[in-house]
Amino acid sequence: MKVLVLNCGSSSLKYQLLDMEKETVLAKGLVERIGLEGSRLIIDLPGREKIKKEQPFVNHEVAINAVLEELVREEYGILRNLEEITAIGHRIVHGGEKFSGSVIINEEILKAVEECVNLAPLHNPPNILGIRACQKLLPNTPQVGVFDTAFHQTMPRKAYLYGVPYYWYEKYGIRRYGFHGTSHKYVAYKASEILGKPLNELKIITCHLGNGSSVAAVKEGKSIDTSMGFTPLEGLLMGTRSGNIDPAIVTFIQEKEGLSAAQVNDILNKKSGVLGISGYSDFRDIEERASAGDDKAKLALEMFCYQVAKYIGAYAAAMNGVDAIVFTAGVGENSDVVRKEVCKYLEFLGATLDEEKNKIRGKEAIISTPDSKVKIMVIPTNEELMIAKETLELVVNK
């Protein structure tokens, strides 16, 4: 059984075709600069060089159609025909309070996703365009929506509500939603598998650290708290996002600099975080600059690691203990520097890092010492596989 996973951004489309019997990737790639000049399609087939094709893609429908044409191209030998695709799984950023799990898409579901647009004005519209395009191009293939926010819908009210007038929540849905849910869920499940213990007996803190970063407290298989909030701007200092700041800074800086609300929003989302501190948004550059003696890069790295450690400490308290701490995503999987810096704050928990084991990159491993009371782990995330699994489960069991 083959599942096509799609992740539609405002001007991009990432795709992956998976063979679910072996859980292997048959093809993956992306279409970039949709609707802009210089758009191109990239096809990445196992064991072959990447194929790049520059051509105009005016919208998502044209882009998806081009991807489907490539998947059935005879010379690649991926699919004989499009009927071989059992189902399509769509990554949808925001499901609000409407969705606490993945769903088979129909008109009613699509309408509910459209109602969440005001919560994710940049992300949900292209997700919807991708679904509509697939309905047109593959009308008989079932489609499933997998929501970034769904995993965190198990948070209790004390964790998801803010200390603002209650009617803001009732009228506008202002609350903590959390993001990266598919990733947090995948690595929590994987951790229980590696540890050989049932998920419902574990307290796990998952650290999804990349250009966008979030930490989650997963108790007995359920998310009970997470660092991102109403939007993905809350929580940790990130590549270009500020993370937590005093809300009064917003009005203060608007007055001082004569900025509009939209301008401040743009600065906090795109010009802040480690970029604002150091001038670099890529953690690889920051590590390089820091080791070369760049003071601002060093500061940005210290701030980031300090904040990750603070969240881990807070979530250990929220769960009244922790069995495992998992590092995942681009920085979490590949930066031994970040992991070492974070873990030096965690000895009070009985979490001890094995510096030799910590040298690994992008591989599954337990990197704590044998006598560490808390297991420290690296688990590469695989959101596409998680989306494909949930898609297939729904389609097969419907």
UniProtKB/Swiss-Prot annotation:
Subcellular location: Cytoplasm
Pathway: Metabolic intermediate biosynthesis; acetyl-CoA biosynthesis; acetyl-CoA from acetate: step 1/2
Listed GO MF terms: acetate kinase activity; ATP binding; magnesium ion binding
GO CC, alphabetical: cytoplasm
Database matches in SUPFAM superfamilies: Actin-like ATPase domain
Cofactor(s), by name: Mg(2+); Mn(2+)
Residues annotated to bind ATP: 14, 208-212, 282-284, 330-334
NCBIfam families: ackA (TIGR00016)
Subunit structure as annotated in this protein's UniProt entry: Homodimer.
Name this protein carries in UniProt: Acetate kinase
Organism: Carboxydothermus hydrogenoformans (strain ATCC BAA-161 / DSM 6008 / Z-2901)
Gene: ackA
